[in-house]
Amino acid sequence: MSIASVASVFKGEHAVGSKVTVRGWVRTRRDSKAGISFLAVYDGSCFNPIQGVVPNSLDNYDNEVLKLTAGCSVVMTGDVVESPGAGQAFELQVTELEVAGWVDDPDTYPMAAKRHSIEHLRELAHLRPRTNIIGAVARVRNCLSQAIHRFYHEEGFIWVSTPLITASDCEGAGEMFRVSTLDMENLPRTDAGKVDYDKDFFGKEAFLTVSGQLNAETYACALSKVYTFGPTFRAENSNTSRHLAEFWMVEPEVAFANLNDIAGLAEAMLKYAFNAVLTERMDDLTFFAQHVDKTVIDRLQSFVSSDFAQVDYTDAVEILQNCGRTFEFPVSWGIDLSSEHERYLAEEHFKAPVVVKNYPKDIKAFYMRLNDDGKTVAAMDVLAPGIGEIIGGSQREERLDVLDMRLAEMDLNQEDYWWYRDMRRYGTVPHAGFGLGFERLVSYVTGVNNIRDVIPFPRAPRTANF
Protein backbone atom coordinates (compact mmCIF):
# COMPACT_ATOMS: atom_id res chain seq x y z
CA MET A 1 0.00 0.00 0.00
CA SER A 2 1.24 3.49 -0.80
CA ILE A 3 0.16 7.08 -0.21
CA ALA A 4 -1.23 8.41 -3.49
CA SER A 5 -2.27 11.84 -4.68
CA VAL A 6 -5.50 12.07 -6.64
CA ALA A 7 -3.49 13.29 -9.63
CA SER A 8 -1.20 10.25 -9.54
CA VAL A 9 -4.19 7.89 -9.59
CA PHE A 10 -5.75 9.68 -12.56
CA LYS A 11 -2.42 9.59 -14.40
CA GLY A 12 -2.38 5.79 -14.10
CA GLU A 13 0.70 5.72 -11.88
CA HIS A 14 -0.92 3.03 -9.70
CA ALA A 15 -1.89 -0.25 -11.35
CA VAL A 16 -5.50 -1.36 -11.38
CA GLY A 17 -5.97 -3.61 -8.36
CA SER A 18 -3.23 -1.99 -6.31
CA LYS A 19 -4.09 -0.74 -2.84
CA VAL A 20 -3.46 2.95 -2.14
CA THR A 21 -4.32 5.54 0.48
CA VAL A 22 -5.74 8.88 -0.62
CA ARG A 23 -5.98 11.77 1.84
CA GLY A 24 -8.14 14.82 1.27
CA TRP A 25 -11.42 16.64 1.84
CA VAL A 26 -14.97 15.66 0.99
CA ARG A 27 -16.60 17.74 -1.70
CA THR A 28 -19.87 15.77 -1.89
CA ARG A 29 -21.44 12.58 -0.58
CA ARG A 30 -24.13 10.62 -2.41
CA ASP A 31 -25.84 7.55 -0.93
CA SER A 32 -27.48 4.77 -2.94
CA LYS A 33 -30.33 2.51 -1.89
CA ALA A 34 -27.98 -0.43 -2.34
CA GLY A 35 -26.06 0.55 0.79
CA ILE A 36 -23.13 2.24 -0.96
CA SER A 37 -21.92 5.81 -0.53
CA PHE A 38 -20.04 7.72 -3.19
CA LEU A 39 -17.60 10.30 -1.88
CA ALA A 40 -16.02 12.95 -4.09
CA VAL A 41 -12.68 13.64 -2.41
CA TYR A 42 -10.14 16.25 -3.50
CA ASP A 43 -6.59 16.89 -2.33
CA GLY A 44 -5.62 19.87 -4.51
CA SER A 45 -3.22 17.92 -6.73
CA CYS A 46 -5.53 18.28 -9.74
CA PHE A 47 -8.87 19.80 -10.63
CA ASN A 48 -11.17 16.77 -10.40
CA PRO A 49 -11.91 14.92 -7.17
CA ILE A 50 -11.61 11.15 -7.03
CA GLN A 51 -14.67 9.03 -6.36
CA GLY A 52 -14.44 6.79 -3.33
CA VAL A 53 -16.97 3.94 -3.42
CA VAL A 54 -17.70 3.12 0.22
CA PRO A 55 -19.70 -0.05 1.07
CA ASN A 56 -21.93 -0.33 4.13
CA SER A 57 -19.82 -3.27 5.28
CA LEU A 58 -17.31 -0.86 6.81
CA ASP A 59 -17.49 -0.84 10.61
CA ASN A 60 -17.88 2.94 10.76
CA TYR A 61 -20.32 3.23 7.85
CA ASP A 62 -23.44 4.12 9.86
CA ASN A 63 -21.89 6.25 12.59
CA GLU A 64 -19.31 8.11 10.48
CA VAL A 65 -19.52 7.66 6.70
CA LEU A 66 -23.22 8.59 6.55
CA LYS A 67 -22.47 11.73 8.57
CA LEU A 68 -19.74 13.05 6.28
CA THR A 69 -20.41 16.49 4.80
CA ALA A 70 -18.57 18.92 2.55
CA GLY A 71 -15.26 19.98 4.10
CA CYS A 72 -14.67 16.93 6.29
CA SER A 73 -11.15 15.53 5.95
CA VAL A 74 -10.72 11.81 5.36
CA VAL A 75 -8.07 9.15 4.84
CA MET A 76 -9.35 6.54 2.37
CA THR A 77 -7.62 3.24 1.69
CA GLY A 78 -8.80 0.99 -1.09
CA ASP A 79 -8.21 -0.66 -4.44
CA VAL A 80 -7.72 1.30 -7.65
CA VAL A 81 -10.35 0.22 -10.19
CA GLU A 82 -11.42 1.41 -13.59
CA SER A 83 -14.42 3.68 -13.25
CA PRO A 84 -17.59 2.64 -15.08
CA GLY A 85 -18.91 6.19 -14.89
CA ALA A 86 -18.15 9.02 -17.27
CA GLY A 87 -15.72 11.78 -16.36
CA GLN A 88 -12.89 9.82 -14.75
CA ALA A 89 -10.83 6.80 -15.68
CA PHE A 90 -10.28 5.46 -12.17
CA GLU A 91 -11.96 5.39 -8.79
CA LEU A 92 -11.27 3.87 -5.39
CA GLN A 93 -13.07 0.85 -3.95
CA VAL A 94 -12.71 1.83 -0.30
CA THR A 95 -11.83 -0.87 2.23
CA GLU A 96 -10.99 1.44 5.11
CA LEU A 97 -11.96 5.04 5.88
CA GLU A 98 -10.74 7.23 8.70
CA VAL A 99 -12.28 10.62 9.43
CA ALA A 100 -9.41 12.98 10.21
CA GLY A 101 -11.52 16.07 10.89
CA TRP A 102 -15.20 16.99 11.07
CA VAL A 103 -16.95 20.21 10.08
CA ASP A 104 -18.41 21.56 13.33
CA ASP A 105 -21.71 22.76 11.88
CA PRO A 106 -22.42 21.74 8.27
CA ASP A 107 -25.33 24.20 8.09
CA THR A 108 -23.02 27.18 8.64
CA TYR A 109 -19.93 25.89 6.81
CA PRO A 110 -19.06 28.80 4.49
CA MET A 111 -17.70 26.57 1.73
CA ALA A 112 -20.69 24.23 1.48
CA ALA A 113 -21.36 22.77 -1.96
CA LYS A 114 -22.95 25.80 -3.55
CA ARG A 115 -21.80 28.53 -5.87
CA HIS A 116 -20.28 31.61 -4.24
CA SER A 117 -19.58 34.96 -5.85
CA ILE A 118 -15.91 35.73 -6.31
CA GLU A 119 -16.45 38.93 -4.29
CA HIS A 120 -17.84 36.97 -1.34
CA LEU A 121 -14.86 34.61 -1.46
CA ARG A 122 -12.46 37.54 -0.95
CA GLU A 123 -13.94 37.96 2.52
CA LEU A 124 -13.06 34.32 3.23
CA ALA A 125 -9.51 34.25 1.90
CA HIS A 126 -8.53 31.60 4.46
CA LEU A 127 -11.17 29.20 3.10
CA ARG A 128 -11.38 30.12 -0.57
CA PRO A 129 -8.56 27.74 -1.68
CA ARG A 130 -11.16 25.00 -1.12
CA THR A 131 -13.25 26.25 -4.05
CA ASN A 132 -12.81 25.05 -7.61
CA ILE A 133 -11.82 28.45 -8.96
CA ILE A 134 -9.22 29.47 -6.38
CA GLY A 135 -7.74 25.97 -6.26
CA ALA A 136 -7.34 26.08 -10.04
CA VAL A 137 -5.77 29.55 -9.84
CA ALA A 138 -3.28 28.28 -7.24
CA ARG A 139 -2.20 25.36 -9.43
CA VAL A 140 -1.81 27.56 -12.52
CA ARG A 141 0.10 30.14 -10.49
CA ASN A 142 2.45 27.42 -9.25
CA CYS A 143 2.88 26.02 -12.77
CA LEU A 144 3.81 29.47 -14.11
CA SER A 145 6.24 30.07 -11.24
CA GLN A 146 8.00 26.76 -11.76
CA ALA A 147 8.13 27.28 -15.53
CA ILE A 148 9.70 30.73 -15.18
CA HIS A 149 12.37 29.45 -12.80
CA ARG A 150 12.99 26.50 -15.13
CA PHE A 151 13.27 28.79 -18.16
CA TYR A 152 15.90 31.02 -16.58
CA HIS A 153 17.82 28.06 -15.20
CA GLU A 154 17.95 26.48 -18.67
CA GLU A 155 19.06 29.82 -20.15
CA GLY A 156 21.99 30.07 -17.72
CA PHE A 157 20.61 32.82 -15.47
CA ILE A 158 21.41 33.13 -11.77
CA TRP A 159 18.53 33.82 -9.38
CA VAL A 160 19.40 36.74 -7.11
CA SER A 161 17.51 37.46 -3.88
CA THR A 162 17.20 41.24 -3.80
CA PRO A 163 16.26 43.08 -0.58
CA LEU A 164 12.70 43.94 0.37
CA ILE A 165 13.87 46.84 2.54
CA THR A 166 15.61 49.63 0.66
CA ALA A 167 16.55 53.29 0.79
CA SER A 168 16.24 53.71 -3.00
CA ASP A 169 13.17 54.55 -5.06
CA CYS A 170 13.65 52.66 -8.32
CA GLU A 171 10.74 54.34 -10.09
CA GLY A 172 11.21 57.82 -8.64
CA ALA A 173 7.48 57.95 -8.02
CA GLY A 174 7.58 58.24 -4.24
CA GLU A 175 4.70 55.79 -3.68
CA MET A 176 6.56 53.71 -1.11
CA PHE A 177 5.73 52.13 2.24
CA ARG A 178 7.98 53.44 5.00
CA VAL A 179 9.69 50.92 7.30
CA SER A 180 10.34 52.27 10.77
CA THR A 181 10.70 51.20 14.40
CA LEU A 182 10.25 54.74 15.74
CA ASP A 183 7.56 55.30 18.36
CA MET A 184 4.74 56.95 16.43
CA GLU A 185 3.46 58.49 19.68
CA ASN A 186 6.82 60.07 20.48
CA LEU A 187 8.79 60.77 17.30
CA PRO A 188 12.34 62.12 17.70
CA ARG A 189 12.82 65.51 16.06
CA THR A 190 15.76 67.42 14.63
CA ASP A 191 16.46 71.02 15.59
CA ALA A 192 14.50 71.99 12.47
CA GLY A 193 11.48 70.06 13.74
CA LYS A 194 11.66 67.25 11.18
CA VAL A 195 11.52 63.56 12.06
CA ASP A 196 15.04 62.48 13.04
CA TYR A 197 15.52 59.27 11.06
CA ASP A 198 19.07 59.04 12.38
CA LYS A 199 17.42 57.60 15.48
CA ASP A 200 15.58 54.96 13.44
CA PHE A 201 16.63 51.31 13.08
CA PHE A 202 18.62 51.85 9.87
CA GLY A 203 19.84 55.34 10.75
CA LYS A 204 18.00 56.76 7.74
CA GLU A 205 14.65 56.56 5.98
CA ALA A 206 13.88 53.06 4.74
CA PHE A 207 11.08 51.68 2.59
CA LEU A 208 9.61 48.49 1.19
CA THR A 209 11.00 48.00 -2.30
CA VAL A 210 9.04 48.87 -5.44
CA SER A 211 11.43 46.81 -7.57
CA GLY A 212 14.52 44.64 -7.31
CA GLN A 213 15.87 46.03 -10.58
CA LEU A 214 18.60 48.38 -9.35
CA ASN A 215 20.08 45.69 -7.11
CA ALA A 216 19.79 43.09 -9.88
CA GLU A 217 21.73 45.38 -12.23
CA THR A 218 24.74 45.27 -9.92
CA TYR A 219 24.79 41.47 -10.08
CA ALA A 220 24.24 41.41 -13.83
CA CYS A 221 27.32 43.61 -14.18
CA ALA A 222 29.36 40.85 -12.52
CA LEU A 223 27.51 37.60 -13.32
CA SER A 224 26.18 38.53 -16.80
CA LYS A 225 22.67 37.06 -16.59
CA VAL A 226 20.53 37.26 -13.46
CA TYR A 227 16.90 37.52 -12.47
CA THR A 228 14.80 38.28 -9.41
CA PHE A 229 11.42 36.79 -8.56
CA GLY A 230 9.83 38.16 -5.42
CA PRO A 231 7.36 40.52 -3.78
CA THR A 232 7.32 44.27 -4.41
CA PHE A 233 5.23 47.02 -2.84
CA ARG A 234 3.47 50.19 -4.01
CA ALA A 235 1.66 52.58 -1.66
CA GLU A 236 -0.61 53.59 -4.51
CA ASN A 237 -4.08 54.39 -3.18
CA SER A 238 -5.89 52.70 -6.08
CA ASN A 239 -8.88 50.51 -5.32
CA THR A 240 -9.21 48.89 -8.74
CA SER A 241 -9.22 45.40 -10.20
CA ARG A 242 -5.74 46.08 -11.66
CA HIS A 243 -3.85 47.27 -8.58
CA LEU A 244 -2.34 45.62 -5.51
CA ALA A 245 -0.20 47.11 -2.76
CA GLU A 246 1.86 43.90 -2.61
CA PHE A 247 2.55 41.88 -5.74
CA TRP A 248 5.24 39.70 -7.29
CA MET A 249 7.66 40.71 -10.01
CA VAL A 250 9.93 38.76 -12.35
CA GLU A 251 12.91 40.94 -13.29
CA PRO A 252 15.75 39.64 -15.47
CA GLU A 253 18.86 41.75 -16.11
CA VAL A 254 21.37 40.93 -18.85
CA ALA A 255 24.84 42.42 -19.35
CA PHE A 256 26.03 43.25 -22.88
CA ALA A 257 22.39 43.32 -24.02
CA ASN A 258 20.31 45.89 -25.86
CA LEU A 259 16.60 46.54 -26.23
CA ASN A 260 16.13 44.00 -29.02
CA ASP A 261 17.86 41.32 -26.95
CA ILE A 262 15.46 41.63 -24.04
CA ALA A 263 12.44 41.90 -26.34
CA GLY A 264 13.47 38.48 -27.65
CA LEU A 265 14.01 37.22 -24.10
CA ALA A 266 10.53 38.39 -23.08
CA GLU A 267 8.95 36.59 -26.03
CA ALA A 268 10.83 33.36 -25.30
CA MET A 269 9.97 33.44 -21.59
CA LEU A 270 6.25 34.06 -22.11
CA LYS A 271 5.93 31.33 -24.73
CA TYR A 272 7.83 28.88 -22.52
CA ALA A 273 5.56 29.60 -19.54
CA PHE A 274 2.36 29.41 -21.58
CA ASN A 275 3.40 26.13 -23.18
CA ALA A 276 4.02 24.73 -19.70
CA VAL A 277 0.50 25.60 -18.60
CA LEU A 278 -1.02 24.20 -21.79
CA THR A 279 0.92 20.97 -21.24
CA GLU A 280 0.61 20.55 -17.47
CA ARG A 281 -2.63 22.22 -16.41
CA MET A 282 -5.16 21.55 -19.15
CA ASP A 283 -7.66 20.32 -16.54
CA ASP A 284 -7.65 23.73 -14.86
CA LEU A 285 -7.65 25.62 -18.17
CA THR A 286 -10.70 23.62 -19.25
CA PHE A 287 -12.50 24.77 -16.11
CA PHE A 288 -11.59 28.41 -16.78
CA ALA A 289 -12.75 28.08 -20.39
CA GLN A 290 -16.09 26.64 -19.25
CA HIS A 291 -16.82 28.94 -16.31
CA VAL A 292 -14.68 32.10 -16.49
CA ASP A 293 -13.51 33.03 -20.00
CA LYS A 294 -14.22 30.75 -22.95
CA THR A 295 -11.26 32.20 -24.90
CA VAL A 296 -8.44 31.30 -22.47
CA ILE A 297 -7.19 28.16 -24.21
CA ASP A 298 -7.46 29.59 -27.72
CA ARG A 299 -5.77 32.78 -26.53
CA LEU A 300 -2.76 30.94 -25.11
CA GLN A 301 -2.45 28.67 -28.14
CA SER A 302 -2.61 31.68 -30.45
CA PHE A 303 -0.02 33.52 -28.33
CA VAL A 304 2.57 30.74 -28.44
CA SER A 305 2.15 30.30 -32.20
CA SER A 306 2.37 34.02 -33.04
CA ASP A 307 5.46 36.01 -33.94
CA PHE A 308 5.68 39.22 -31.91
CA ALA A 309 5.15 42.41 -33.89
CA GLN A 310 7.39 45.40 -33.15
CA VAL A 311 6.59 49.10 -33.57
CA ASP A 312 8.17 52.36 -32.47
CA TYR A 313 6.11 54.47 -30.07
CA THR A 314 6.02 57.31 -32.60
CA ASP A 315 4.61 55.00 -35.28
CA ALA A 316 2.14 53.51 -32.79
CA VAL A 317 0.80 57.00 -32.03
CA GLU A 318 0.37 57.62 -35.76
CA ILE A 319 -1.50 54.30 -36.16
CA LEU A 320 -3.84 55.22 -33.31
CA GLN A 321 -4.44 58.74 -34.63
CA ASN A 322 -5.30 57.49 -38.12
CA CYS A 323 -7.34 54.39 -37.25
CA GLY A 324 -10.70 56.13 -37.32
CA ARG A 325 -11.47 55.11 -33.73
CA THR A 326 -12.58 57.61 -31.08
CA PHE A 327 -10.79 56.76 -27.85
CA GLU A 328 -11.83 57.80 -24.37
CA PHE A 329 -8.35 59.27 -23.94
CA PRO A 330 -7.20 61.20 -27.03
CA VAL A 331 -3.86 60.16 -28.51
CA SER A 332 -0.96 62.55 -28.96
CA TRP A 333 2.82 62.19 -28.99
CA GLY A 334 4.17 62.35 -25.46
CA ILE A 335 1.32 60.64 -23.62
CA ASP A 336 1.62 57.27 -21.93
CA LEU A 337 -0.55 54.84 -23.88
CA SER A 338 -3.67 53.78 -21.98
CA SER A 339 -5.12 50.29 -21.83
CA GLU A 340 -7.59 51.02 -24.65
CA HIS A 341 -4.72 52.16 -26.92
CA GLU A 342 -2.62 49.11 -26.06
CA ARG A 343 -5.45 46.69 -26.67
CA TYR A 344 -6.35 48.27 -30.01
CA LEU A 345 -2.77 47.81 -31.20
CA ALA A 346 -2.54 44.18 -30.06
CA GLU A 347 -6.07 42.99 -30.77
CA GLU A 348 -7.17 44.93 -33.84
CA HIS A 349 -4.20 46.40 -35.67
CA PHE A 350 -1.47 43.78 -35.30
CA LYS A 351 -3.73 40.92 -34.11
CA ALA A 352 -0.72 39.54 -32.24
CA PRO A 353 1.47 40.33 -29.24
CA VAL A 354 3.34 43.56 -29.98
CA VAL A 355 6.47 45.23 -28.60
CA VAL A 356 6.22 49.04 -28.51
CA LYS A 357 9.69 50.61 -28.34
CA ASN A 358 11.41 53.97 -27.85
CA TYR A 359 9.07 55.98 -25.64
CA PRO A 360 9.35 59.72 -24.86
CA LYS A 361 11.90 60.23 -22.09
CA ASP A 362 9.58 62.46 -20.05
CA ILE A 363 7.16 59.62 -19.28
CA LYS A 364 9.81 57.04 -18.41
CA ALA A 365 12.20 56.40 -15.51
CA PHE A 366 15.63 57.95 -15.02
CA TYR A 367 17.56 54.72 -15.58
CA MET A 368 16.39 54.14 -19.16
CA ARG A 369 19.02 54.73 -21.84
CA LEU A 370 18.65 58.03 -23.68
CA ASN A 371 18.45 57.56 -27.44
CA ASP A 372 20.49 59.60 -29.89
CA ASP A 373 17.50 61.82 -30.70
CA GLY A 374 17.59 63.20 -27.15
CA LYS A 375 13.79 62.89 -26.95
CA THR A 376 13.20 59.18 -26.47
CA VAL A 377 14.62 56.38 -24.35
CA ALA A 378 15.30 52.74 -25.22
CA ALA A 379 12.21 51.48 -23.42
CA MET A 380 9.74 48.81 -24.43
CA ASP A 381 6.35 47.45 -23.43
CA VAL A 382 5.02 44.04 -24.45
CA LEU A 383 1.30 44.28 -25.22
CA ALA A 384 -0.80 41.12 -25.25
CA PRO A 385 -4.21 40.67 -26.89
CA GLY A 386 -6.85 40.56 -24.20
CA ILE A 387 -5.04 42.54 -21.51
CA GLY A 388 -2.65 45.15 -22.92
CA GLU A 389 0.71 45.76 -21.25
CA ILE A 390 2.12 42.65 -19.63
CA ILE A 391 5.86 43.48 -19.54
CA GLY A 392 7.80 46.73 -19.31
CA GLY A 393 11.54 46.99 -19.83
CA SER A 394 14.44 49.00 -21.16
CA GLN A 395 18.08 49.18 -21.97
CA ARG A 396 19.66 50.77 -18.91
CA GLU A 397 21.67 53.98 -19.03
CA GLU A 398 25.31 52.87 -18.73
CA ARG A 399 26.90 56.33 -19.29
CA LEU A 400 27.54 58.13 -16.00
CA ASP A 401 27.29 61.65 -17.38
CA VAL A 402 23.95 60.95 -19.04
CA LEU A 403 22.65 59.15 -15.94
CA ASP A 404 23.56 62.15 -13.78
CA MET A 405 21.79 64.45 -16.23
CA ARG A 406 18.65 62.31 -16.05
CA LEU A 407 18.74 62.22 -12.23
CA ALA A 408 18.96 66.02 -12.20
CA GLU A 409 16.11 66.35 -14.70
CA MET A 410 13.90 64.25 -12.44
CA ASP A 411 14.99 66.11 -9.30
CA LEU A 412 16.50 63.00 -7.72
CA ASN A 413 19.45 63.22 -5.33
CA GLN A 414 22.67 61.76 -6.79
CA GLU A 415 23.89 60.82 -3.34
CA ASP A 416 20.91 58.52 -2.81
CA TYR A 417 22.09 56.54 -5.83
CA TRP A 418 25.86 56.66 -5.20
CA TRP A 419 26.25 52.88 -5.43
CA TYR A 420 24.16 52.71 -8.61
CA ARG A 421 26.35 55.44 -10.14
CA ASP A 422 29.45 53.52 -9.06
CA MET A 423 28.52 50.75 -11.49
CA ARG A 424 29.07 53.25 -14.33
CA ARG A 425 32.55 54.10 -13.06
CA TYR A 426 34.02 50.62 -12.86
CA GLY A 427 33.84 48.66 -16.09
CA THR A 428 30.44 49.85 -17.24
CA VAL A 429 28.67 47.80 -19.91
CA PRO A 430 25.49 48.11 -21.94
CA HIS A 431 22.81 46.12 -20.16
CA ALA A 432 19.06 45.69 -20.26
CA GLY A 433 16.17 44.10 -18.44
CA PHE A 434 12.44 44.08 -17.90
CA GLY A 435 9.77 43.62 -15.26
CA LEU A 436 6.83 41.24 -15.45
CA GLY A 437 3.98 41.73 -13.01
CA PHE A 438 3.35 38.12 -12.09
CA GLU A 439 -0.27 38.56 -11.00
CA ARG A 440 -1.11 40.17 -14.34
CA LEU A 441 0.35 37.10 -16.01
CA VAL A 442 -1.78 34.76 -13.88
CA SER A 443 -4.84 36.89 -14.63
CA TYR A 444 -4.13 36.68 -18.36
CA VAL A 445 -3.69 32.91 -18.32
CA THR A 446 -6.77 32.15 -16.20
CA GLY A 447 -9.15 34.82 -17.45
CA VAL A 448 -9.79 35.84 -13.82
CA ASN A 449 -9.99 39.59 -14.29
CA ASN A 450 -9.65 40.93 -10.76
CA ILE A 451 -6.02 40.80 -9.70
CA ARG A 452 -7.09 40.28 -6.07
CA ASP A 453 -8.31 36.82 -7.00
CA VAL A 454 -5.01 35.52 -8.41
CA ILE A 455 -2.86 36.12 -5.30
CA PRO A 456 -3.51 34.12 -2.12
CA PHE A 457 -3.95 37.00 0.32
CA PRO A 458 -4.41 40.33 -1.48
CA ARG A 459 -3.09 43.55 0.01
CA ALA A 460 -4.85 46.73 -1.13
CA PRO A 461 -6.06 50.01 0.41
CA ARG A 462 -7.85 49.17 3.69
CA THR A 463 -7.35 45.46 2.98
CA ALA A 464 -4.75 43.66 5.09
CA ASN A 465 -6.74 40.89 6.72
CA PHE A 466 -5.51 37.34 7.20
From Swiss-Prot:
Keyword Signal: no
Protein name: Asparagine--tRNA ligase
Primary location: cytoplasm
GO biological process, alphabetically ordered: asparaginyl-tRNA aminoacylation
PROSITE patterns on file: AA_TRNA_LIGASE_II
Quaternary assembly: Homodimer.
GO molecular function: asparagine-tRNA ligase activity; ATP binding; nucleic acid binding
Record-linked InterPro entries: Aa-tRNA-synt_II (IPR004364), aa-tRNA-synth_II (IPR006195), aa-tRNA-synth_II/BPL/LPL (IPR045864), Asn-tRNA-ligase (IPR004522), Asp/Asn-tRNA-synth_IIb (IPR002312), NA-bd_OB-fold (IPR012340), NA-bd_OB_tRNA (IPR004365)
GO CC annotation, single: cytoplasm
EC numbers, comma separated: 6.1.1.22
